[in-house]
Amino acid sequence: MNEFERVRAYLTDLQDRICAAIEAVDGRARFQEDLWQRAEGGGGRTRVLRDGAVFEQAGIGFSDVSGSRLPPSASANRPELAGASWRATGVSLVFHPLNPYVPTTHANVRFFQAQRDGEVVASWFGGGFDLTPFYPFDEDVQHWHQVARDLCAPFGDERYAAHKRWCDEYFFLRHRNETRGVGGLFFDDLHGDFERDFAYLRAVGDGFLDAYLPIVQQRKDAIYGEREREFQLYRRGRYVEFNLVYDRGTLFGLQSGGRSESILMSLPPRVRWEYGFTPEAGSAEARLADYLVPRDWL
């Protein structure tokens, strides 16, 4: 297999493994698969689990798509590639749990190639994972970042710090002056050594369940009421704001004529906004603000 096909094979297997693990922990709902084709080139398989015992909605999509001209969002940082043809493959997921004590999470791993006259002129990896709690626990955040740091360790002493910082900077809502959650890892435009970079992509993809599932198991049976549920729905609004205003993957998908149902799969099934909402001083809800700033968790 060539490089692209090797990455593609890994990603389809990763989607299968994550789906099996999430179905097992949910115990009730199953993923429904939607196979789709893209007119300009390629396609994918979108899987969505809804109304489960643990997950209100869990979406995970695999795609392998191509086009004749790079959209602006993809060539903004690489102007020399403007107008090149391209092919991209990736797995992207967002899980929205029902219980407000279980954090929402997002992960993405992807590979991109640009071509001219049938020759690959550039290729790079990107991805990461991040956590968005509504009622955070220090031990959960520390576990999340410990897994991230451990998987980064074989790739150099600076890898975790650099990609954690990138995550904090990327998942930041400037109009709210807060991070989307407690961070994790984020990287893009990783290139130079295919085997080493592909190994890192696999470490991130494989490490996601190690980071997330123990938190789900610890919090999924926590007792909650209407107050916690209403706060969860309110905070989900921040997720919508980020994805529609800032997220490069969403912008790339829409600009490149992607499948809107799959692109917007990340949005929560239920959400609310409330004008001028301010949590009660000293409350658990007010405490969340202390976590929405970059900090060293380990």
From Swiss-Prot:
Its EC number is 1.3.3.3. Keywords: Cytoplasm, Heme biosynthesis, Metal-binding, Oxidoreductase, Porphyrin biosynthesis. Substrate binds at S92, N108, V109, R110, G257, G258, R259. GO terms for biological process: protoporphyrinogen IX biosynthetic process. Pathway: Porphyrin-containing compound metabolism; protoporphyrin-IX biosynthesis; protoporphyrinogen-IX from coproporphyrinogen-III (O2 route): step 1/1. It catalyses: coproporphyrinogen III + O2 + 2 H(+) = protoporphyrinogen IX + 2 CO2 + 2 H2O. One of its GO terms (molecular function) is protein homodimerization activity. InterPro entries: Coprogen_oxidase_aer (IPR001260), Coprogen_oxidase_aer_sf (IPR036406), Coprogen_oxidase_CS (IPR018375). It is an enzyme of class 1 (oxidoreductase). Its cofactor is a divalent metal cation. The record marks H175 as: Important for dimerization. The active site is at H106 (proton donor). Residues 239-274 are annotated as: Important for dimerization. Transmembrane segments: none annotated. Pfam families: Coprogen_oxidas. A divalent metal cation binds at H96, H106, H145, H175. PROSITE patterns: COPROGEN_OXIDASE. It is found in: Cytoplasm. GO terms for cellular component: cytoplasm. Belongs to the aerobic coproporphyrinogen-III oxidase family. Homodimer. Involved in the heme biosynthesis. Catalyzes the aerobic oxidative decarboxylation of propionate groups of rings A and B of coproporphyrinogen-III to yield the vinyl groups in protoporphyrinogen-IX. HAMAP family: Coprogen_oxidas. This is Oxygen-dependent coproporphyrinogen-III oxidase. It comes from Stenotrophomonas maltophilia (strain K279a). The lineage of its organism: Bacteria, Pseudomonadati, Pseudomonadota, Gammaproteobacteria, Lysobacterales. The gene is hemF.
